[in-house]
């Protein structure tokens, strides 16, 4: 057990630290803080902890006579740290008669400590407070130093006081019940204090990280009985005793630092702001990422960024930054906002640069507008004794991954610099393998601290190859080798990022690893690029030698599984070494440990990079093994059996490839650079770069055995190199290319060409480097020629010819391909652009993308370029954010034959205004119009699949972002390469839409179609094989049933058009802002209910599918249900709900696999809303939230048992959880036990307005809550077999109850005009009012006088609710309107008067909506794109028709009329963007190229058509044949029901015709919604209006 420790602060020993010290805690408070009243304050979460209950009981039992104990419990979470909670607590203290001698005891985390401390500081002008912190963060930070505060709506901690506690009693035992993430969160502050003040403690923390994470990750949830209430609670439990010593020390040491700093600077004037290390930047991230990210997580990122800032200034060494980053990762903290797990946790929120800087400007350390940041000098020490001023330019650089390199203008020609590059990656990785296999201790100095070596160190540790520790503040790594005897298989895959060297060396090392009782293999894996890089020659050799290895993904690349029960035999091993010398080195280093001596023969031609093989052999010699080179056989080596003996010290030479960058900088800028630890004795081939490349180009070179100095010629005088074989130094060719780009000579025939050869292996490095250099040099205006094993660079005649990379839209970035060498090379060329311009000329910088990729070998390169070499750098917001806005991601449609791909692809293109390409047709075009069937007969399926894949990859590469719909062949998923391309496109934001239908129907159809290629096997077998592939490759899915009638076909089209608009974001899903409802369906199968679905949804903004009620949960069945519902209800938004049993539903609680599948179906089907229960496992919640796309998430919680009153913390906790998950709507359903529960609910609703909230009580006692709920109230219908929850009401019942309470005022509405005797408006509106239970009345007011309407209705009727205006008042009424809608202004008439209140009125016109909606309802897409429109007639209605056709996106609208002279004034009176073309002669129609697919007839219907007009009309009707949808004509007149225009259009030209009654009802329903806020029940109204 640990001892109780006392830590002094401000001269008093008041901080006590121990474990299980409850008795000491009670005794200390009672003995040293005597009082008549003790008040324990905590939150409800802590009340569940047994240790807290024990403490309260013990406190009560120990009270002296005359003293009392009060307990006050607040709701958990940051929201409680408010003025309101403070006031409530103060009122409680006053009511309880607390006086000046009161002692407040704050037991809890930072929120409780801060708030109770502030109450204590102001109550009775200050009473005593004792802090008992229960979270790690509170123990080491917020409880110490006397800072107290509450939050305000404008910011955190803005109101507070310094009020020192009487005691801070820290009991480690509280941490047993701390949630895992909170525990890890607190470690950020612990690491911070060690980092700024205590290097020894930092080292101790490093060595205990794995113990900590193992224990914390092992936390379990346990059920406990509450000693105070006897209720059963569930709490987290961590086995603190398993790491008690470590936890105690980390808390104690962290407290000591804070106490010492506070003691010397209580009021935070200087020294105390050192405690803000990591906080300046961390707080800025926190401000954006809260509440998803925790304080410590953001501080962790802030520390790394602020450490990088110090390194950028040349103050902190790269090793120290690497150590800090490594320890944070080891304790489970994020080090970058871009880490995959952290991005998912923070729901992919963006952290824009300008917002970060804005947030940083609100920091108490700042002085005015100048920002200050704590700068670290080394681990354990800050630079200076307070924060330092930092410019926005430097902060921008640190905060982004995109770098702006300004011209190298202010660099003096006589500049001389010494640069020491990091240790060689090649030597570092070899040294780690050799030392791990060797025996004894080896101190490795100047080891490269990079991603590659980090992966290697981790692997050596995981495989138990050696014991690893650090000395010299982390600058020296100490490897205690065990001679290979302890190598053991590890269970977790070894992740190697993009570290090629590590992956190749570890593949051979894996052959030496021993099995354990539970583990017989190890897995090596890496990132996406690593999984493309070759490793086959090495694997082939090892397999041939007895090691069993499997590829787990792509043949020839990682990931691989190496079986540890096979043996590395030795003997003769043959290896192809023309691709990578690392294969050779890998086998060489492990060869001494084979079962017999090894003869390694390199076959297949001259090996690549032989110098690296020589390097390995020389290093093996240093570790005690001598390799012999054969004198009789070329490229053959003999390696004896033995084991390495570790030298006591091994110094890693600097990386010669990295040294090429500062040396090239000298060459290009005419300055001098010395690299002091690489000379002609170097083991590395790249050490020749200065001598063999830069010297012949015109540089002065001084090279000793151990150093190299380069002095460049005057700027602009470098000479091209006619030919250089860079095979001994292939990695340096990229540096040579950028030097060559600015080299030129006086020979007019040379074209300034530098020819580089011997570098074929560079095509399979981190990227295809030869192609990368050619592509990016072209952006600077530099031409290149690719060679079979090299590149020619054609230098520019003058540096002034270098261009800033840009395209038609402005500057573009230089791509680095996640390749460190590409990035560092172009950082040099970027600075030469505009470097020769006049000093005062404004020069645009060059943007380099992904600068962090240099972390692979030289994390501090940018710091050296800036601080040592004098380059001006800046950071910038990524360009992709702006460019992606304009990209229109294409849609790829996949699915079985006969799934409807051809038809639906056309609909898709039409709905989105995209271009359509059928890939089978494209295939035929590319193969001389040979059909797919013929091609397959001649060449076979395999060849066809290859070609199909090639074409698909090509179109995606070229047109994936350009708004295309690609219709594919059914078998595209048969090829693994195509499947990968489909998945890659989907993951890059493209739409891969799986179209499917009932397989039985498909089979019947296919067997009767002779035009398609014959199947080799049965259709059902094909479906069974492909079904999984279709699902795996698609990110969206649409079920398209076979349609037997035109009406069904049109309904399906409407439903698909809305679906595709929703998933692509064209149609935004809106959460209703006013009173609204959704109906809850409880059917087990919707197939038989289609007739009832529309009336069931009357008055609702959405419909809920209770998936848990469905007959089965198969993907096809559920998709079909969604399709039926969409078609039947005209795509009313769907709420997809799977209600679990414990939340009151039918779905089994633990069936998480099926639940995940159902959510996947929902998201692929683009449902508008998805109900996500807040009680589900967090991994499922985050998975759904991160995949939600455009779907809105409803976070729901139901209390069916009535366990929680609305003032219980359960609801507060759940609301905070919903905020953290960033759901779109919160849905809480309680149970009303008594009427008062409704009042408590309303108080909750009133205080939780920062998210749309659905909150209702079940049972009949809770009915009132359903009436008062505003947003999306769940309702039932009389047509449902049963309601989904007790107490559910219908829309009509709710409206009637709301009316009786005064919520809806009865209104009187009228149709005005003359004659109106036959007007259908009263029946139209009154039908709607009756169905929806609205109290309004609609009547006729017949008059020809607008003046009378104003007097009697607008001014004279206090219940006036609106008017439908008809002839002759549509123009006259406008003078009395206070506002006109755009439609009313353009159409020039008002048919709808809307009261605005205060005797003000708005004039609108819904005729155009009547026309538009009637057309859409009859199969016309919402966007008709490339189709033209036609209006027949030029009267008043024609203006509404023109407005409607323009709103549908008609690019041109033609208009014809009996009297052509009326056309010109009509066209001139309308906006020019309507693009209206009046047709005066029949002849001019022949020249029209456009398809005309939509028309509106506005001519009188009671007379025959004029011959001239009829002739024009017929010529237009012919043009409907090639429209992208069924050509449709709407008749604006509703009497007679069939007009001459309708007859000729339908019978002679097969146009679909829409009668005027539909326009009438649609415009009336639009009025209905504008007046009442409710969608009108269209079908019922239509039936009522047209039944006579």
UniProtKB/Swiss-Prot annotation:
Its EC number is 4.2.3.4, 2.5.1.19, 2.7.1.71, 4.2.1.10. It holds the Pfam family DHQ_synthase. Keywords: Amino-acid biosynthesis, Aromatic amino acid biosynthesis, ATP-binding, Cytoplasm, Kinase, Lyase, Metal-binding, Multifunctional enzyme, NADP, Nucleotide-binding, Oxidoreductase, Transferase, Zinc. Residues 890-1080 are annotated as: Shikimate kinase. It comes from the Eukaryota. Pathway: Metabolic intermediate biosynthesis; chorismate biosynthesis; chorismate from D-erythrose 4-phosphate and phosphoenolpyruvate: step 2/7; Metabolic intermediate biosynthesis; chorismate biosynthesis; chorismate from D-erythrose 4-phosphate and phosphoenolpyruvate: step 3/7; Metabolic intermediate biosynthesis; chorismate biosynthesis; chorismate from D-erythrose 4-phosphate and phosphoenolpyruvate: step 4/7; Metabolic intermediate biosynthesis; chorismate biosynthesis; chorismate from D-erythrose 4-phosphate and phosphoenolpyruvate: step 5/7. NAD(+) binds at residues 43-45, 78-81, 109-111, 114, 134-135, 156, 174-177, 185. The keyword Transcription regulation does not apply. Binds 2 Zn(2+) ions per subunit. Residues 1306-1588 are annotated as: Shikimate dehydrogenase. One of its GO terms (biological process) is chorismate biosynthetic process. It catalyses: 7-phospho-2-dehydro-3-deoxy-D-arabino-heptonate = 3-dehydroquinate + phosphate; 3-dehydroquinate = 3-dehydroshikimate + H2O; shikimate + NADP(+) = 3-dehydroshikimate + NADPH + H(+); shikimate + ATP = 3-phosphoshikimate + ADP + H(+). It is found in: Cytoplasm. The active site is at 268 (proton acceptor), 283 (proton acceptor), 853 (for epsp synthase activity), 1198 (proton acceptor), 1227 (schiff-base intermediate with substrate). Residues 1-392 are annotated as: 3-dehydroquinate synthase. CDD domains: DHQase_I (cd00502), DHQS (cd08195), EPSP_synthase (cd01556), NAD_bind_Shikimate_DH (cd01065), SK (cd00464). Zn(2+) binds at residues 189, 279, 295. Homodimer. Present with 6420 molecules/cell in log phase SD medium. This is Pentafunctional AROM polypeptide.
